Amino acid sequence: MASRQAPLCGLAPCCLWLLGVVLLMNASARPANHSSARERAGNREENEILPPDHLNGVKLEMDGHLNKDFHQEVFLGKDMDDFEEDAEPRKSRRKLMVIFSKVDLNTDRRISAKEMQKWIMQKTAEHFQEAVAESRAHFRAVDPDGDGHVSWDEYKVKFLATKGHNEREVAEKIKNKWDLNIDEETQEVLENLKDRWYQADNPPPDLLLTESEFLSFLHPEHSRGMLQFMVKEIIRDLDQDGDKKLSLSEFISLPVGTVENQQGQDVDDSWVRDRKREFEELIDANHDGIVTMAELEDYMDPMNEFSALNEAKQMIAIADENQNHYLEPEEVLKYSEFFTGSKLVDYARSVHEEF
């Protein structure tokens, strides 16, 4: 698989090769994902070497759920942490209006779809740069001899060490091809990781990853081949009839069983509504009711300019109360929760304060 040196031209999410993720019940049972990216965390050692289950600026999570934070990630970029729920409202409103001014390239006090598209691409590029920097640091953690290559055995030793195994003992067992005595769940995760390792290994395969290949291993959105592999895994997980395509009913499948209370019913209703809108408005490009691998790949490619434009139009439509196809300061402030994750009160009055 060739590593992508330049951003893909063809967006922005997947699969069961994730670390630590339990297999889903079956393709028709997809529970809603209630946690946001801000709430996800693992132990530090695992975070240094394991592929993340959340990719900033990618529409789908690695388990096939919609990325709940996507709009904030591509609108706020590195400023996302500044808009926490307990932030001082006036300060947050001012920051939001500063961002508005940056997106508004022609300074006409309204944001067009083209302006939003350019902003989305800029913020996505920032996430790409962050991923490269993080991957470089993590590569050093798994390349103990500093030879610029990481073997599968070297990685396996580090991985098992994060699971509580003695690093020296594991290395000795692997060297002598002795039984590692690991539990079934850990073995399954290792097999999934090895499959992913093979996919990131540029031909001719040697099970040695360079720094750029290791980036593709951790962040499949940086590699065309890994992105395609990711798409195949998603379709495999969701495809119920085996046609290697996704129908609307397959994409919005709910967990098996009856909800126990109204809150659970509301969650299910929200799951169906959000995924139906995403399927019909953004993923199914030719609107034939079927999503192909090519359509899902375009949707998941973070640097696909056409998908970024569609996303920009959808983001504007959500807050465009006067339906003029532009975003105005009042609308951005009123729908601040959508753009920032925080609800900022007194939005109308603050427009005059901040401008």
Swiss-Prot record:
Q: Where Ca(2+) 5 is bound, by residue?
A: 320, 322, 324, 326, 331
Q: Report if keyword RNA-binding is assigned.
A: no
Pfam families from the entry? Answer: EF-hand_7 (PF13499)
Q: Which residues bind Ca(2+) 1?
A: 104, 106, 108, 110, 115
Which parts of the sequence are annotated with region: Necessary for intracellular retention in Golgi apparatus lumen?
A: 302-355
One GO biological process term: calcium-ion regulated exocytosis
Where primarily located?
Answer: Golgi
GO cellular component annotations of the record: endoplasmic reticulum; Golgi lumen
Q: Which residues carry this modification: Phosphoserine?
A: 92
Q: Where does Ca(2+) 4 bind?
A: 284, 286, 288, 295
Glycan-bearing residues:
33
Q: What is an example of a GO molecular function annotated in this UniProt entry?
A: calcium ion binding
- UniProt superkingdom: Eukaryota
Residues at which Ca(2+) 2 binds: 143, 145, 147, 149, 154
Alphabetic keyword roster = Calcium, Glycoprotein, Golgi apparatus, Metal-binding, Phosphoprotein, Repeat, Signal
Xref: SMART domains:
EFh
Show where the EF-hand domain sits. Answer: 91-126, 130-165, 226-261, 271-306, 307-342
Q: Which residues bind Ca(2+) 3?
A: 239, 241, 243, 245, 250
Q: What does this protein do?
A: May regulate calcium-dependent activities in the endoplasmic reticulum lumen or post-ER compartment.
Q: Which PANTHER family match?
A: 45 KDA CALCIUM-BINDING PROTEIN, RETICULOCALBIN
What does the record say about domains? Binds calcium via its EF-hands.
Q: What is this protein called?
A: 45 kDa calcium-binding protein
Q: Which organism is it from?
A: Bos taurus
